[in-house]
């Protein structure tokens, strides 16, 4: 079976990044390379982008993040999937950014920071209708109260995945 094929040209990808920067200025970019770069090749795309320190590479799981680290990628790497007890300490050791989307995740991170002193960069995810991962938006005050009592938990950012952003009516998004 013959299917679509994508070719990634280093110079064109770099030019696209430069063009984006003309609109956003000197800000960090989070570029999704998960699922093997959506078929473009995780290592291929990451090797092109990793020359720019202010690019954060987003992967789905710890295995993709480890593969990037093993291949010399020093950029910040953000893992979209929910943290797991069996790999979270390894993520902290590799200085990976993690997704916190459930109360159990917060409790786990709080315990690990207390026990190990390792301090990862954390992004909180709130569910805004996608219903996959994320704190319920009605719990936001409780989450922030919990965190205000624990200043050692380093929150780098807050994000969501808008479920209807690509539809005609964006009032919910």
Region roles according to the model:
Residues 1:
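Gly-rich Lys/Arg/Thr-decorated short loops/hinges at beta-loop-alpha junctions or inter-strand turns
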Residues 4-8, 12-15, 25-173:
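Active-site-proximal beta-alpha core segment in soluble small-molecule metabolic enzymes
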